């Protein structure tokens, strides 16, 4: 399937749950459900799609992110703070509010943006 132009987000603000993330065109597995994490296979597919539309680099899907180009997360180490521009897979509608692990509910964003979103 072809990538949609830009792949930016159009979020439902009315709480209807009809988010349309930048990967909504990808076909979900039958195991998709509320409160679930994205699988390793889903993450790999979304990274590939993101890089296809961004000339081989991973870029944030959210225009409000602090960073445009994102870096691969390093292995977590005790006492080492991760880089704020590492990519993370964000549930557009949070899991604790019934958000699913559907492709349509995901955006790739920086660690900083995702962490600050948690604190709102």
Language-model features and meaning:
Residues 57-65, 110:
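Short cysteine-rich clusters marking metal-coordination/redox-active sites
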Residues 66-108:
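Histidine-centered nuclease catalytic patch
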Residues 102-120:
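Active-site or metal-binding loop neighborhoods of secreted/extracellular toxin and effector enzymes
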Residues 52-58, 102-106:
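Short metal-coordination and nucleic-acid-contact micro-motifs, chiefly zinc-binding Cys/His arrays
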Residues 1-51, 70, 80-85, 111, ...:
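Low-complexity, glycine/serine/proline-rich disordered segments
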């Amino acid at each position: 399937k072809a990538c949609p132009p830009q792949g930016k987000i159009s979020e439902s603000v009315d709480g209807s749950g009809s988010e349309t993330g930048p990967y909504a065109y990808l076909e979900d597995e039958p195991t998709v459900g509320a409160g679930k994490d994205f699988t390793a296979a889903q993450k790999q597919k979304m990274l590939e799609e993101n890089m296809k539309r961004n000339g081989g680099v991973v870029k944030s899907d959210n225009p409000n992110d602090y960073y445009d180009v994102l870096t691969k997360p390093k292995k977590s180490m005790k006492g080492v703070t991760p880089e704020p521009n590492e990519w993370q897979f964000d549930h557009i509608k949070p899991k604790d509010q019934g958000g699913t692990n559907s492709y349509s509910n995901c955006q790739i964003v920086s660690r900083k943006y995702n962490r600050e979103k948690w604190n709102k």
